[in-house]
Amino acid sequence: MILKSELLDVHTRLGQMLPFVTKRFASVPTAMRTRRRTRRHEREPNLRKRQGGSHSNLKENEDAELKFKLRQMNEFAKNLKMQMQLADSLRRKEEAARAEGIGGDVAEGAIERDSSTVAAALLEGAEPAEAQPAPLNLSQLIMSAQNAEPLLAPELAERIGDGKLVYSALVNKRAQNWDAIVAALYESAEKLRGLDADIVKEKLLLRVSGLSLEGVATLDKLLTDRFGEGRDFDVDMYGVLFETLGEHTQHTQQAKTVVDRMKKLLQRYDACDDPDKKPLTQEILNCCLKVGTAAKSFDDMNYFLSKFVKDYRILPNKVNYDQVLTFYLKNRTLSQAWETFGAMKFMSLSHRPDVATYNLMLQVCDQERNYSKALDLYHEIQDLKMEPDVRTLSMLAKAMASASTDAIVSEGKSDSLRLTGWKFIHEIENNPKYATAKDDPVCAHGVLTTMMALASYDGDVGLARALFYRHAVQSYKKLMKNANMDAVSNPAAAARAAWTQAIDPVLFNYLLMAYSRYQPNKLPILLGYELGAKFRRQLMFNVDYMGRAESDNDMHANIPLLPVMELSSTAEVLNESRALWEFFLSKHINGSLQPQPSARVVSMLEEYRQNHDTFEGFMKEVKSQVKRWQWHAVNRRLMTPITIMSYLSIPLRLGSYEEFAFRYKQTIYTGNELEESVKNFYDPALVTVSDEATVVVDDSEVKVEKYARKIDDRILQIYSFAYKNRVYNDVFELAMKAATKFRDNSLATRVWKERGEFRKTEGYTSMSVKDRIAGDTSFACATVKFFVAEKRFSEAMAVIMSSQKYIDWKYHMVRELHNALVSIEDSVSIRKLLSVVNKQNRLKVLNTESPSLTP
């Protein structure tokens, strides 16, 4: 910028050189003080230019710049890796097709046509179109000089003799079908005979994966046919079998079957008397412990541990001890988990607990709702100079959330514990070193579950809805993308099936808990500080409940959530929770839990009634049919005892008696209700209309229509049980609490009678003694509280005195009754009540009141 004095000097000199030019003065406008394009500087920070300011500002700027660069590099590496994998997969497919003689020329022409598409996508940083992938990228340039590996070793492919089978089974690296390869080898004439052991291990055993239980049995027969059951069947082959069997731990019953097969393999290994046979390994022991954990069997775990220690001289290592901790965690034997964890600290350095072990113990703290132990473990991690990972911070926050639900455990600091949990979540979100770990689906789901727990226990319905909706829509779109809707004849039915699979039962239960804890006048804890308010606002603004985005055009159906960010009344909470329950649990295309039986159902019931001469046989047939209907009509993956309790707790806590009665009738049924409905349909006396039809001829059609309508109502009543769940212990306790809150004496009487009838059913007698006592204790406590609320103290005392032999009464169970007796100064009842509660005085009371047996 030219200053004014310099400008005057220039004009003076120009005037001296050019006398005929008139001197003029010009005013030059100054530059604008406002800086432009600030958004560009914020989005693309300059790492070389250091801005001035305090040390704290410099540190914050450096952290932000480093975080930005890390995200940029991770995104670039992710795109590059994806393109390399795509090109490598296509190259291998083409070379395998050429080796098998399947369409080589056609595939080569397709590669040449699609090369420009992939090259352009790499330059632009975008994904190529799925229909036109091309392998001309960096991966192909690097591997162009290498020889292509065949999908299957030539020695094995020759024995199969079917190139198309090999190609179709192994061409997709992400979903290879080794069951077909193993079955084809076993059905071949030569099988594995004549092949060297090294070739079998390298070309088959090291590559095989994802075998079913039948495939593992076939592979075992294949190896036994070649190597026998003696010395030639070495440890490496046993290791492959055990490792493949260890993958089948999805269900407890399946795990028990796998345990039996593992025991047979160990018996076969013991039957070999060769002194030079190789010993088993720690990996095999860990596979056995993994399956024993899934089977939830103490006997199986003791069998494997004792056998490997005594017979094979293999002591458990740290990985094995972690598996033992997982077993204790699943079986809720938490005291033994603490003992094992304490023993690991005093073993060798190789057994010292690491972050993974501490994460398991944080889950134990979560189950115990012990936040103090969780914080102590976190301080131990810091003192040992170990680096906590995302799972560590997530489990810490989860333990804080669980402890905040119990007023006694939290010591009146529920909000402080939830605030501490949210601080751990903020550390995960804002720390750059956890940026890459959050891309792991397991870690991301764990953080999401923890956030849902914190929001639900705080009653933050707005945040819980946003998190649930975002996860549900993402899962639904992924399922619909894989479903290939163009080839589906009924898109609405496919969308309904996708929604039933997209919902996580744990997240759905947390959303129901958030509804039940809703308070219109309560401020969410995140709004109490600036960072939390900003974090909550960002999450809620990223959700579009209306589905107006362009990517939501193909959703075919949307979740029935109100198109608002925050719910403003209990009526909205009740209506939305009921709509979600019916939408997700019903497998019907319209999402309704009010079924209409088809003509096939009507004819089936009529046929059952005609084929059975006795009511008992008809009742047995209908019960089995109702169970089959329940699996096909309702999404049983979501309709669990836990979600049912959360669903029924919403109107109970919000104080809506009509809504609670409607949901209870819609969701729960007893055995007597089913029996009465079936008897009403079966008994011929209830459906005889011949006399009425012959009295007046003109009214015959009216009588017949009335008769048909009654039959339809009975069938509808029977079919409605397919959409309900049979009553169980916790439901009786919840119903008694509802009778206490709503002061409904008739409901309490009915629940008391139904609970007595439930004790005679097979569902109660099949329970363990521990579970039966726990159920009786909780229901007795709820009954005592009802009698106290109704000021029927003598009946409350009768319940306690009659059950003291089976129930271990504590003072916190009878606190309300004791305070009520003190208020009316009933000293006799107080003395009896304290004698039952106080364990030390029980023996004295029995000795003084019971008659002596000696003269």
Curated annotation (Swiss-Prot):
Function: Regulates mitochondrial small subunit maturation by controlling 15S rRNA 5'-end processing. Localizes to the 5' precursor of the 15S rRNA in a position that is subsequently occupied by mS47 in the mature yeast mtSSU. Uses structure and sequence-specific RNA recognition, binding to a single-stranded region of the precursor and specifically recognizing bases -6 to -1. The exchange of Ccm1 for mS47 is coupled to the irreversible removal of precursor rRNA that is accompanied by conformational changes of the mitoribosomal proteins uS5m and mS26.
One Gene Ontology cellular component: mitochondrion
Residue stretches of each PPR repeat: 234-265, 317-351, 354-388
Phylogenetic classification of the source organism: Eukaryota, Fungi, Dikarya, Ascomycota, Saccharomycotina
Span list, region Disordered: 29-61
Homology family: Belongs to the CCM1 family.
Quaternary structure (record): Binds to mitochondrial small subunit 15S rRNA.
Disulfide linkage: none
Organism of this sequence: Eremothecium gossypii (strain ATCC 10895 / CBS 109.51 / FGSC 9923 / NRRL Y-1056)
Protein's name according to its UniProt entry: Mitochondrial 15S rRNA processing factor CCM1
Compartments in which it is found: Mitochondrion
InterPro entries (alphabetical): Pentatricopeptide_rpt, PPR/CCM1_RNA-binding, TPR-like_helical_dom_sf
A Pfam family this chain is assigned to: PPR_2
UniProt keyword Mitochondrion present: yes
Note: Involved in mitochondrial-nuclear incompatibility, a major determinant in reproductive isolation between species, through hybrid incompatibility of Ccm1 and its interacting partner 15S rRNA between yeast species.
GO molecular function per UniProt: mRNA binding; rRNA binding
Chief place where the protein resides: mitochondrion
Protein keywords: Mitochondrion, mRNA processing, mRNA splicing, Repeat, Transit peptide
Domain of life: Eukaryota
GO biological process, one term: positive regulation of rRNA processing
